[in-house]
Amino acid sequence: FEDFNPSPLAAASIAQVYSAKLKDDQKDVVIKVVRPGIKNTILSDISLMRRIANFAEKKFEDAKRLQLSRLVSEYEAVILSELDMRLEASNIKQTKRNFEGNDLLYVPDVYLDYCSENLLVMEMIEGIPVDRLETLNDLGVDLKLVAERGVEIFLKQVFIDNFFHADMHP
């Protein structure tokens, strides 16, 4: 990278997001970095959840009926897939293909050559978060139209594409 800002743009439990500039073509990008050691922490937490679920299923009929162990296994599969930035890159690329030629949604480019299991690099897009209502109102943004388009995007993903990608920002 030509330039890398060490102050995160955003931080969540699994990853942090930074801004940078590519060395090759000077494009502004965002870099999503999986937190070091988070996989081991998650695996430890899942192990504890599994032990609690197994215990509860032996002691309580409702826990057995709710299939808590199965629920933990499903959660494990989902959360571990969220740790792989290559899978997220692939999902973003698929979403971009699904919305090609559609002006409802702009999906940023992913720079696959820079991506790895713990790193996602994608085009920097400037925008205003939808929760900044005062700013959007000041700019005259039609919030009803934004909501309608959000629903349309969701419905297209679910019922037309049969592919839903919810993490639309790094």
Regions found by a protein language model. Give the residues of each.
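Conserved catalytic cores of large enzyme domains
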Residues: F1-P170
